[in-house]
Structures are given as C-alpha cells and as structure tokens.
C-alpha cells in the first residue's frame, strides 16, 4: 500500500501542512534584513540663504549635501505580541492533528477498497477451484457414459448430455480465469503494486470463516470514527478563528534595532574612505482604531461557520448511526444466508451420492445425475458467495464502528 500514489499524495499533504505551520510560527523568530544603496546627484539640490553682509541684496545659493552618497543598513525586528502569530502558536497542534486525521480518513477508505478487492480475487479463485473439481467429475462421468453407450447399456443421449455438461463447465472455467486476471489487475491498482510483477496471494477458508464472525450485540461509539474526530478538530479550529477576530483589537508590539553606515563625498573614488555610522533601537506599538466594522462582521461570520459545523457534526452523527444499523443488518442477513448455504451443501452432496449410486444401479436416469451435479456445484459456489458477502459485510461493520486499522 505504501507504493499507492494516493498514499504518497496523502503523505505529501501532511508534509505541506507541517510546513505551513512552520511558516506561520517563523514570525516568532527575529527578522533580520540588510539593504544597501548608492546615489549620485547629476545636479545637486541647493538652499537659498540671505547674504549676511548684504541683507537687502539677493540671496545666496548654497549646495545641499554632496555629489555621492552610499549607505548600508542592517535592521532586526522581534515580535513581542502579534495576534496573527499568537493564534498561529495556539492552533499549530490542531492543524497538525487535522492533517493527520484527514490523511487517516482517506487511508481507511483505501484499506477498505483493498480488502474488498482482495476478497473478490479469493472468491473468484475458489470458484475456479470448484469448477475444476466439477470438470474432473464430469470428465469421469463422460467416460462412464461413453463406456455404457459402447456397451449398449445406455443410449447416445446420456453421452451427449455428459458432453454438453463438460463443455459448459469448460466455458465457465475460461470465464473465471479471465475474470481473475481483471480482478488481480484492479487489486494491484488499488494497492499501488507494479502491474508487471506477479502478485502472490494466499487464502485460508477456515481462517476466513473464523474472522468473519463478530459480536452482533455491540453498539457504535461515534468518537471512534475518524470522520467524527476530524469534525471535532475542525470545530476547535473554527472556535480559535472566532477568538482571533475577537482579539484583533489588541495592539501589536515589536522591538527593532537598526544600524546604518553612511558614506558621503564629492569625489567618487574617495567615497568609501570615510564612513558615518549611526544606530537606533526601540519599540513599535500599533493600535487598530477603526476598521469600518470589519472586526464585528468577521466575528459574526465566524460564529455562523461554527454553528454550521456544529450542525454538520450532528448530521454526521446521525448518518454514522444509520450506517452502522444498515451494515449490521446486512451482516446478520449475510450470516444467516451463509449458514443456510452450508446446510445446502450437505443436502446437495447427499442427493448427488444417492442419485449417482441409483444411476449405477440403473434406477435413475443420467439427466437426474446431471441435475444433482449441477445442484451440488451451485450449492458450493453459493456457499462461497455467501462467505465473501459475509466478509464484505464484516468490513462494512468494522468501518461503521471505526475499527479499520491503517497501521501496516
């Protein structure tokens, strides 16, 4: 299953969620930046100053600054309190849990699909084995019918009927073999198994019969369902979102430090020979004074979303109860059908043995032998079908109870 592309995608989705959390929490760390600049005045700005020696005369033009300027600046900021970063820290655990639960929910569906595809292949293989046994029996019957025909004990009708029955069984065998190929291909697909590699499957009918039996008196606990757990996590995250909007009136406080190195000169090749550094440290505080009622509207919207999620939770709870009742009802019905088909095999086997013996004694016709053989094969195949339907129902009940394991 680890080779399944969807499983790999789920692992990537979890990884993306973890990275998003780290990105949000990174704002708690100091943010350090550097910048540099170089400037040359093609024409220097000037200031007009009165002539002290001739106050009533024209004003004097005095150049402002120098022709060449350069600066290197280092700045660092540290969030002390910020609502965005604060809520990111509070919700990080729930977002990790949400990603894990989302992945687990999808994995459960994959496991269910793999189990059902696996049992479908086993069912077809067991049916093929029954058909092969029937072919062996029919081949022997055909030889017996031919021998009786050659000896004149029976007419050609019995021989032809035996031939028809054998041909039908051979046709069923071919259909079963081709069906198995398609089902194995589908099983490989849902497993993510390379299609060109052989897939070795083992089955034990007795073990399957034992595994198929479950306690029919147990009740559902929706808290065991990963879908319900995910909804609970979503409710917590939505509540945190409402709290975020409620707290959006709080100020943002951060500390900062700046260090500047300034270079100035009228001659370019002398620019970096002398520097004039300066530095500052301080606190920055910002208050949201008025945002056009956006905060209030966001709170109302978030509360509505929370209420909707609550209703989703209630509806999902009811759906899970219905799903469990339906799955358990199907299981009980399939269990009764399976036990009935077990009895049918015993009866069909007794009928076949009796009819075969009476045919050999000349009491019964060959047609009755064919009918009893067909009934026996049908009873065995029906028993297999009932067993695998019981296994499918077993899986559905376990899924409804939240007991499907994905820890492989």
Region locations from a protein language model:
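Sec/SRP-type N-terminal targeting helices
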Residues: 6-12, 25, 69, 80-107, ...
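Periplasmic alpha-helical coiled-coil/stalk elements that build and connect Gram-negative outer-membrane
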Residues: 19, 109-222, 330, 334
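Short flexible linkers and secondary-structure junctions
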Residues: 1-116, 253, 257
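Bacterial Sec-pathway N-terminal export signals of envelope proteins
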Residues: 1-37, 43, 195, 201-239, ...
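Flexible, surface-exposed loop regions and adjacent strand-edge segments
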Residues: 49-55, 206, 271-275
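Extracytoplasmic loops and strand-loop junctions of Gram-negative outer membrane beta-barrel proteins
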Residues: 54-60, 216, 265-268
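Transmembrane beta-strands of outer-membrane beta-barrel pores
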Residues: 38-42, 80, 259-263, 287-289, ...
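Short segments within alpha-helical structural elements
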Residues: 26, 168-193, 346-403
